[in-house]
Amino acid sequence: MHRLTNAAITTFLGEAARYEAAARPGLQLALSNEAVADLNMLVVGAGADHGHFRAMLNSCLDRRLPFLAVIFPAASKAFDDIAADLGLAYAADFPFMVRDDVPLEPSGNPDVEIVCASIDEDADASADVLTSAYSMPKDSVLRALPASLFDSTGVDVYVARTNGQPVGSVTLTYHGDTCGIWAMGTDASRQRCGIGLRLLSTAMAQARHNGIRRFFLGATPAGYRLYEKLGFETVCTTRVWVSGETHQA
């Protein structure tokens, strides 16, 4: 799961206007360089070195860049101690969930229209949703997740609309026959209306049609019940530390 997450966040943020990445054994840093913690991530797993971890944390702190440190279970509690010593705050236990290959059909609110994003208008619509769902500045979202992302063979972004208005968005990253699910969001004023279920089940059904056989995601508390309903099961729980403010907790 650690390696899949590394590959996925690199794909997810790779089209950001100010994208920057660095890697060491057991460590992957992927930065949009936007002032939004949820768009800058350091992933920590087995084999990571304490000194390299500290150096990567300091490289972000020295620039006053908000970011998340996502520590997988294979990394010892010593990494948590280093994060705390450097002033990061513990945000949450963050479960990663997997859904293996079982049949799936679109469900949820049938009045929601789902499209696979392809044009600038769709990028703007997705940004509107993420701005509402996660309190992110829209200009930061558009720079971090631009329309050029749609041209990547490793990514699809799906947008949900009702009456022409954007109400949901989700990003899928592809890794062989495995798919990562990221930036799943519903407009804050339209939650609990079956939009998220319709959006995600439709996107996943299309991915299965295209040959995907396994899905994984990191589950926020707000989305956990939806993911369980769709057959996801927790396979490990990471520890998330933050410098700045996160809306993943």
Specify the residue positions occupied by each region the protein language model found.
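N-terminal charged segments
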Residues: 1-64, 75-76
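A short helix-loop-beta-strand connector motif used in the catalytic cores of GNAT acetyltransferases and
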Residues: 15-17, 65-66, 91-94, 149-159, ...
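A conserved beta-turn-beta hairpin within the catalytic core of GNAT-like acetyltransferases
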Residues: 35-41, 91, 174-182, 191
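Acyl-donor-binding surface of acyltransferase catalytic domains
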Residues: 46-121, 241-243
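Conserved acetyl-CoA-binding loop-helix of GNAT-fold acetyltransferases
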Residues: 50-57, 186-188, 192-205, 209, ...
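Conserved GNAT acetyl-CoA-binding A-motif
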Residues: 63-73, 207-219
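Conserved active-site alpha-helix within GNAT-family acetyltransferase domains
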Residues: 76-90, 197, 221-237, 244
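A conserved beta-strand-loop-helix scaffold within acyl/acetyltransferase catalytic domains
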Residues: 138-189
